[in-house]
Every structure is written in C-alpha cells, then in structure tokens.
Amino acid sequence: MTKKALSAVILAAGKGTRMYSDLPKVLHTIAGKPMVKHVIDTAHQLGAENIHLIYGHGGDLMRSHLANEQVNWVLQTEQLGTAHAVQQSAPFFKDNENIVVLYGDAPLITKETLEKLIEAKPENGIALLTVNLDNPTGYGRIIRENGNVVAIVEQKDANADQLNIKEVNTGVMVSDGASFKKWLARVGNNNAQGEYYLTDLIALANQDNCQVVAVQATDVMEVEGANNRLQLAALERYLQNKQASKLLLEGVMIYDPARFDLRGTLEHGKDVEIDVNVIIEGNVKLGDRVKIGAGCVLKNVVIGNDVEIKPYSVLEDSVVGEKAAIGPFSRLRPGAELAAETHVGNFVEIKKSTVGKGSKVNHLTYVGDSEIGSNCNIGAGVITCNYDGANKFKTIIGDDVFVGSDTQLVAPVKVANGATIGAGTTITRDVGENELVITRVAQRHIQGWQRPIKKK
C-alpha cells in the first residue's frame, strides 16, 4: 500500500492563565526550548509535509520566538474549542493526506508512538491515542464495543460502570483530510461551555459507520501537558532523567542524574565524566576522557580529548584543544579558541581570542580580541585593553612571551617572540623580539616616614 502524505496540526492558541506569565503557555521551555518547539520537531521527524500551527494569545510573541520554524501560521482569533481550532486549518487539508492533531503544551510525544498511531488508522476512519490512568478522574473515558471506540464519555456524564474505566482520551488523533473536513463541518456547540469539541468526531464517525480505533501510549508522560509551572517542572525532570539515562547507557559517567541538565545536544567520546549541577546547552561535543567539574555551564563548545574543566567554569561558543586545563571559575566567551595543553585558571576571562599550544593564563586576567602564541606565560592581573569607548582593537603576542603580573596591554599592540614584560608595566607601543620592557617608576625608600594622624 502506498504510504499517504502526512500533515500535522498543532494546537497552540491557549493563553496559559495558570502560568501567571506574559508568555503564551506553549512558549515556556523544557530542556532549553519551548514546549511547542519539541512538538514541531517531532512532527518534522515524523515526516509531516505541512505543519499547521494554530496560534492566538500572544501572537506577536509566538511569531517572534518561532520565526525560523517552517510552519503554516493559522490564527484562531477566538478560542471556541478544540474542533474550532482544527477547523481553522481545514482549508489547507488535502483530501487524501493523513492529518495528525497534536498539542503544543504536550511536548513529550514521541515519533515512535505517533508512527504506531498512523499505522493503525483505518481507511476513512480515526485512530485515537489513549492512555490508561490509575486515577482517571476528570478525563473523558473511552467506550469500546468489539474493540472499536464508539464514544468518549466525560466525567460528569459517566455512569458508575463508566467511571471505573481506566482508559482515557489524550486528544491526539489521526484521520484523512476529507474526513476531517466533513466531520468538523458537522460539529455543534450545544454544550454547557458553548464550544466545539474534537471529541465529537468520534460519534460522527460512528454515525457514518466509519471505524474508530484506539492505540494506547505506553508511557503516560508522553501525553502529559503542562498547565502550570508545577506540571512544567515535572515534565522537565522527567525529560532530563530520560536524557541522563540514555547518556549513562552510552558510557558517560554522570555522577548524579538528578543534578544534570541537557538543554540541547551532546556528542561525546569514551570515559567522559560529568560532576553534579552541570548544564549543557546548545550543541556540545566532548572528546574522550573529558572531565567536567561541578557547577559548570557549557554552551555550543567543542572540547578535545583529555581536557579537564574544573568546577564553576562557564564556556560559550568556544573551542578547547586536547589536554587543556580550564578553571576553576574560568570564563570562555564566544570566539575563544584554546590550543592543546593550554592552562586557563581561576577568574580568567577570554573573549574572541586564540591561545597557542602550551600557553598559560592562570589567574585574574582578561584577554579580549587577542592572539597569544605558544608557550607563553600570562601573569596574574594582566589586562588586554581592547576598547577605546567606540572601537575594539587587537593585541598580538608571539611565542615564548612572558607577561608579568599586573600588566596592561593597550591595543592595538604587538609583542614579538621571546619578549619579557616586567610586572606592573603598561604597554602602549610594540615590543620587539627578545626585548625586556618595564615601565615602573623607580622604587624610593623614605626613612623616618610619619603616617598622617587623624584629626579629632
């Protein structure tokens, strides 16, 4: 059988009142990206040719936060129920394609579960995703006859036998475009809320003698939504534990999975060790035998083999060569590139600079817009003065240079190979090869000096 084309509808128009936030509900993040972005990504992985994103509250924020997403923006000006939301996108449906309905506040739905749902969809019928709950209170119960779904009964309308049913509706469903358009046009709003409900499609399909089947999600968390921050935090912890478990099984030593956050993607080598309270953001690549100390934050970095990053260091948009040592309390800002066997120590900040092989910047130093050669020693308290209040300028330091403590290098300036700069020096002109430069005033000794006396 030829596989049908697929489109997705993502309902994301809700305000999220219980979030107590100016952000639309679906823009609140788990694992570093908006809930709705997780759903969009899953729809892409599923092979959806079109993704119709139904939006309403906070429309400008939605469009700005998701500006790069390949979606068809469909505005729902009034929120009149789930069927009304899907109906806004119905003009875009092709009759012979499958349509899967997803929810922007249920971010953990997986490609594998949706594939099973699509595969189970009967011709001209509906496949409904359900789940078994130990406590189904408040959810619509699934009523079956001969295995098929004949109705969804809401809690308030259920009789005693129906209240004992554990299988409930998740709202996720698949049907073809023609059937969706036909049934959506017949949905009424004759209910207490005066809204148009997607669950009414089940009865309409049965009226037309079209089969409705149910596929059960094996993991309840896949279909859990987040209506408040407590539920959002529960989804976050679940996903973080799932990600940490996967990494542990791949050989990464995460000392405490409950205190590890992955907010992006992590590519890793062998024998990687990650201590507690480490945050990984964006795209991070770790080589073999990398050790990351407690409390570090790594964002969009590439780390070579045998690197140790000591506690409480922050690295962003940087590259670190093999056998380097970073921290503790180091900061690598965007554009920092450290060669092999470099040392960057406590309270050192490096931005948009390269540091050559074997060079050391060990204490209390700022290096910005600079090039440092190999086997250099940059002493404590050194500052590259790269900004004149309007423009940035470069400092270029050659190989085998020794820069003494408390030195200021006022850019633009070049220091040639083998130069030595004495402690406390301010460099304003280029330094030649193998030169010693020192600008300190002569030390004076004044005998019998009397300290000032406080006036009464």
Curated annotation (Swiss-Prot):
PANTHER family xref list: BIFUNCTIONAL PROTEIN GLMU, NUCLEOTIDYL TRANSFERASE
Similarity comment: In the N-terminal section; belongs to the N-acetylglucosamine-1-phosphate uridyltransferase family. In the C-terminal section; belongs to the transferase hexapeptide repeat family.
Residues that bind Mg(2+): D105, N227
Gene: glmU
Protein's name in the database: Bifunctional protein GlmU
Signal peptide: none
General function of this protein: Catalyzes the last two sequential reactions in the de novo biosynthetic pathway for UDP-N-acetylglucosamine (UDP-GlcNAc). The C-terminal domain catalyzes the transfer of acetyl group from acetyl coenzyme A to glucosamine-1-phosphate (GlcN-1-P) to produce N-acetylglucosamine-1-phosphate (GlcNAc-1-P), which is converted into UDP-GlcNAc by the transfer of uridine 5-monophosphate (from uridine 5-triphosphate), a reaction catalyzed by the N-terminal domain.
Annotated keywords: Acyltransferase, Cell shape, Cell wall biogenesis/degradation, Cytoplasm, Magnesium, Metal-binding, Multifunctional enzyme, Nucleotidyltransferase, Peptidoglycan synthesis, Repeat, Transferase
Cofactor, free-text remark: Binds 1 Mg(2+) ion per subunit.
Residue ranges that the Swiss-Prot or TrEMBL entry lists as coiled coil: none
HAMAP family, per database record: GlmU (MF_01631)
The species this protein was found in: Haemophilus influenzae (strain PittGG)
Region (N-acetyltransferase): 251-456
Keyword Repeat among UniProt keywords: yes
GO cellular component: cytoplasm; membrane
Catalytic site: H363 (proton acceptor)
Membrane-spanning segments: none
